[in-house]
């Protein structure tokens, strides 16, 4: 049996085993459990039964983001008041949970930066950004930009995400606030900002919603890739804020960019309808781009199509997801998809077939 055939066989067996256990308990099978979604080399089998968390013990509200640590554990940030972070093993079992009292947890980044070990960077919509150890001990908290010279006293501030570069510099996306990307050094000193709010449908370097940010290290020099959710775009910048390029993804209101290998992954939180490209809930899917910024697969969405070099509008195909807020790419190539406003449900695993 070839490695790919073996992988497909194992993925089928794992989802079938989970389903049989559920049926033995007299519970109905979730919709689209075991369905195959995606395109080309990025096809997956849906496993909605991967997570073993007990809602009575480890409840969630919105499952905003997830990252895998170097030792293989999975860290999930939620906005449930009981805890900010749940830590899982790769089989979906909860190992532990902890809280910094954020209550509005939104962004989660794991990074070494210039440190010897990984740290977690937690972002709260209420304005707190905390660097902490992987067991939840605070190490650093960034200053409020209204108190360090970045903003005026009355400027809105509601950060959604941070990215950490190799020198430990922290890049903050103020995605629900004033739409700037703020730069801090590894000690938390404010260095500068770029971006700002735009109301124009095309305005490179300005944002209508700078929802996510990540370091893209696939090229000769690291770049900062930023989500422009409302305009269905990703935009790339130098680390000091010079605009390099952008890509338009019609119909896809994307979440943060996730770089893994040579590809960029993102959850589509809001989607379009045929002939209606407004932001609609319940139309989510996952989108995957190669290193030429071309969409190669849309798990849960329609197959990407280009016409005369231009990407045609992308829509949900099979309603596996409601509102995809993040994608965690595991070391084995599987995906775990986190969702916003989806009935306090846990993340869904997509088991890679090829």
Regions found by a protein language model. Give the residues of each.
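Surface-exposed loop and turn segments in beta-propeller and other repeat-based domains
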Residues: 48-57, 140-153, 192-205, 296-317
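Blade-level signature of beta-propeller repeat domains, shared across WD40, Kelch, NHL, RCC1
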Residues: 323-354
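Blade/loop signatures of beta-propeller domains
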Residues: 26-48
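Short loop/turn segments immediately following the C-termini of beta-strands
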Residues: 79-80, 125, 175-176, 229, ...
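Loop/turn-rich, solvent-exposed surfaces of beta-rich toroidal or solenoidal domains
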Residues: 252-302
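Conserved beta-propeller blade signature
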Residues: 74-76, 119-121, 170-171, 223-225, ...
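Beta-rich, blade/repeat-based domains predominating
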Residues: 57-71, 101-115, 147-169, 200-223, ...
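N-terminal secretory signal peptides and thylakoid transit peptides that target proteins
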Residues: 1-17
């Amino acid at each position: 049996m070839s490695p790919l055939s073996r992988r497909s066989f194992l993925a089928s067996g794992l989802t079938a085993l989970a389903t049989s256990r559920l049926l033995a308990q007299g519970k109905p099978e979730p919709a689209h459990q075991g369905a195959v979604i995606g395109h080309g080399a990025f096809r997956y089998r849906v496993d909605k039964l991967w997570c073993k968390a007990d809602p009575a013990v480890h409840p969630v509200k919105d499952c905003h983001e997830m990252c895998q640590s170097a030792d293989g554990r999975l860290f999930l940030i939620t906005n449930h008041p009981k805890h900010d972070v749940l830590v899982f093993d790769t089989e979906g079992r909860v190992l532990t949970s902890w809280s910094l009292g954020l209550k509005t947890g939104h962004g989660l980044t794991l990074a070494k930066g210039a440190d010897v070990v990984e740290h977690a960077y937690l972002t709260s919509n209420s304005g707190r950004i905390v660097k902490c150890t992987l067991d939840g001990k605070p190490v650093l908290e960034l200053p409020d930009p209204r108190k360090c010279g970045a903003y005026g006293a009355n400027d809105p501030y509601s950060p959604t995400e941070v990215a950490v570069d190799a020198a430990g510099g922290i890049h903050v996306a103020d995605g629900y606030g004033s739409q700037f990307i703020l730069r801090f050094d590894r000690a938390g000193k404010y260095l500068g900002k770029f971006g700002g709010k735009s109301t124009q449908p095309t305005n490179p370097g300005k944002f209508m919603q700078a929802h996510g940010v990540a370091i893209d290290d696939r090229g000769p020099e690291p770049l900062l890739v930023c989500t422009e959710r409302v305009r269905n775009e990703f935009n790339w910048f130098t680390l000091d804020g010079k605009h390099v390029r952008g890509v338009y993804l019609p119909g896809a209101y994307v979440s943060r960019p996730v770089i893994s290998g040579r590809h960029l992954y993102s959850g589509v939180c809001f989607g379009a309808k045929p002939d209606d490209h407004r932001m609609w809930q319940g139309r989510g899917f996952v989108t995957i781009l190669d290193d030429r910024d071309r969409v190669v697969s849309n798990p849960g969405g329609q197959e990407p199509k280009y016409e005369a070099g231009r990407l045609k509008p992308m829509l949900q195909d099979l309603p596996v997801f409601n509102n995809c807020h993040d994608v965690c790419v595991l070391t084995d190539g599987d995906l775990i998809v986190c969702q916003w406003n989806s009935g306090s449900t846990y993340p869904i695993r997509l088991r890679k077939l090829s």
